[in-house]
Structures are given as C-alpha cells and as structure tokens.
Amino acid sequence: DAAADTLTIRFIDNGCGIDAETVQKVINPFFTTRTTRKVGLGLPLLKQNTEQTGGSLDIQSEKGKGTTVTAVFGLTHLDRPPMGDLAGTVVLTASAYPDIRFIFHYQNDKVDYVFDTKEVNEALDGISIQEPEVIEYLKEMIESNISEE
C-alpha cells in the first residue's frame, strides 16, 4: 500500500492451527516443535525484519482451523530487505509440494495477480507441476504478471 507506505505479506493456511500459548512461543528463536534441530528462526527473523522497518508481525491461529501470519514492513524504509525472487520462490514451493494447493496473490497500486495451483493443475491436465519445463514456464508467467513495467 504505497499510500500508507507499507508492504504487507500474509501467509494463510488451513492446517491444524496452534493454541494461544504456542502462538506466543513461536517468536522465540529457541522454541521449535521440530525434533531435528532445537532452533526455529523463521518467525523470529521475520518479526525482527518487520520491526526494524517500523512494521509489525501478527500471528492469529485457532486449533483445528489454521493460522494467519501477517508481516507489515515499511515500504520505503531503508532497512526493508529486497523482495528477492518471488516467482522462483512460489514455483519452487508449489512444485516441491504438488499435493498442496498454493494461492499466491500479488497486489499493489498497478498489479493485481493471483496464481492458484488448483487452476494450474487443471490446465496441465495430468502433466506434473514438477516437470522442469513446467517450472520454468510458470516462473516466467508469474514474473510477467507481477512486473510493473
């Protein structure tokens, strides 16, 4: 939202959700539910990055219903990390988990684009989203649709 000088990233899942007590714990870098390693840095680093730009991190979750993580950054703040390769990240994630439906919604003052793996898989008509040619095509498709040029 350029008018508000904010960049908002929202992750929504309809998974198992977490209880209120755990929501408070997940922003601690030394808390994790994983058994492979004892540190969970994803959300703590996201929180740190939002706050260093004057933004915030909000986590809403309900056990059995899912979780919504909203990260708000200062859009023009000098310390806001660059967006990076959004298209590549979306396609890599979608192709790594082909049985999960991913919806990527990119919106700003000039662009409003939705990438939905349900629609993609229907269009592919049995061709795997994991095929290298499909991955490259989808990456180019997303890049062209979110380009502001």
Model-derived segments and spans:
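Glycine-rich G1-box
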Residues: C16-G17
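Flexible, glycine-/charge-rich segments associated with ATP-binding catalytic modules
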Residues: Q52-E149
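Glycine-rich phosphate-binding loop
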Residues: R37-Q48, P82-L86
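Short beta-strand-loop-beta element adjacent to the nucleotide/active-site pocket used for signaling
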Residues: D1-I9
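Polybasic/polar functional segments that serve as interface/processing modules
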Residues: L7, N49-Q52
